[in-house]
A protein has these predicted regions:
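Parallel beta-helix/beta-solenoid
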Residues: 2-15, 20-22, 26-48, 66-76, ...
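Glycine- and acidic/polar-rich repeat regions and solenoidal domains
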Residues: 25, 47-63, 79-371
Length: 371
């Protein structure tokens, strides 16, 4: 047994609890729909790693079902993931298993790419099977991989009002699939009013997250990577009214509208350089059926009415082939000290920022809409 103890703790003198149960609340089969879990303390699970290419276990999760409500719980001390909205196997159970058996001999990432091709082009899934969950007002912390994880099963879900912190701290693991929230194919999901901090990466939207709305969230101290990472997605995705305070705020692919955000960290994005560029899926609107694949060229980003401060600027783009639009954004002079500070008090968190120059003067600005 390999163990890591807090500094100053001698396991020969202290009491040591070893968690061996793989999950706390997790069905033993798929398709158990419309379950509500409310008001519990759920803790101490030896969960396995949750990749998108195999079963994705969590301390709690629907295991490929529809319409769960998980709210007002404390979810903590999961070896890997807190809440899993992911799949129960590679592919989606009865669909994927109906395909003829085959051995995937492609080297490196080619194996996973071919599996994904088979899965999406020959074994798609529908809204009747999974998704449409409500994950609300939970405190999720001290998980080794992710606070919330899910491939496909998070589609059409509402994730709101959660406090997610201290995820993947202490360098227990390294690699991919680690974040406060990590979702693949989260079509039409809404992530709003969450508070995500002290994680290896705040929010990671990966392959196929189409129609996602990320609104009204507070991110800070996610300083190993970024507050928000959107990887090889084609959009449309909306990122609006968020407060992004970490050193690196945004790393974006394409097809994204960023509106009314306070951005204090670096802003980057551009052409996908992984494995020489990838062809990734896009879908019929508000659906689950792939209608094609396209390269991720970078760009097609729209920036409206954002406030950029401290490290934030629009100067770092990596070969964006698609056009970008900028209008109504305000950038603070890097020489000015806005003293942006997040203060924790007994009744909540407060944002403090010093107004500089002529910011307090009235100024007429053109109304910008998407109409």
């Amino acid at each position: 047994i390999w163990a890591q103890f807090p500094e100053g703790i001698d396991p020969n003198e202290a009491s040591v609890e070893i968690a061996v149960r793989p999950q706390v609340f997790y069905p033993d089969k798929t398709g158990i729909n419309y379950i509500t879990v409310r008001g519990f303390i759920l803790e101490n699970a030896a969960t396995n790693w949750a990749p998108p290419s195999a079963e994705q276990p969590g301390l709690i999760g629907p295991r490929w079902a529809k319409g769960w409500v998980i709210e007002n719980n404390v979810i903590r001390n999961s070896r890997c993931s807190g809440i899993s909205l992911g799949r129960s196997t590679f592919g989606h159970a009865h669909h994927y298993q109906e395909l003829p058996p085959r051995i995937y001999a492609e080297p490196g990432g080619g194996q996973t790419l071919q599996q994904l091709t088979d899965y999406f082009e020959k074994a798609s899934w529908t809204k009747e099977e999974a998704g449409f969950h409500v994950i609300r007002n939970n405190e999720i912390y001290e998980c080794g991989q992710a606070g919330i994880v899910g491939c496909s099963g998070g589609a059409f879900s509402l994730i709101e009002g959660n406090e997610i912190h201290d995820i993947c701290q202490g360098e227990t693991f390294e690699g991919d699939e680690m974040a406060g929230i990590k979702l693949h194919f989260a079509n039409d999901a809404v992530l709003r009013n969450n508070h995500i901090y002290r994680t290896i990466r705040g929010l990671w939207l990966d392959w196929g997250s189409q129609g996602v709305q990320v609104t009204g969230n507070l991110f800070h101290e996610n300083d190993v990577q970024e507050d928000i990472f959107v990887e090889v997605c084609h959009g449309p995705i909306l990122i609006a009214n968020n407060i992004l305070l970490s050193r690196h705020s945004l790393n974006l692919s394409q097809g994204i509208a960023c509106v009314h955000n306070l951005i204090c960290g670096e802003v980057t994005g551009g052409k996908d350089r992984c494995a020489g560029g990838r062809l990734t899926f896009y879908y019929e609107p508000h659906g689950t059926v792939s209608v094609g694949k396209a390269p991720n060229l970078g760009g097609d980003l729209q920036w409206y009415n954002n406030l950029l401060a401290e490290r934030a600027s629009f100067d770092r783009w990596d070969e964006c082939a698609l056009p970008m639009k900028f209008e109504g954004n305000a950038s603070a002079d890097p020489a000015s000290d806005l003293e942006v500070e997040l203060i924790k008090k007994t009744d909540g968190w407060y944002l403090s920022m010093k107004a500089v120059g002529n910011w307090l003067q009235k100024e007429k600005r053109r109304l910008i809409t998407t109409a």
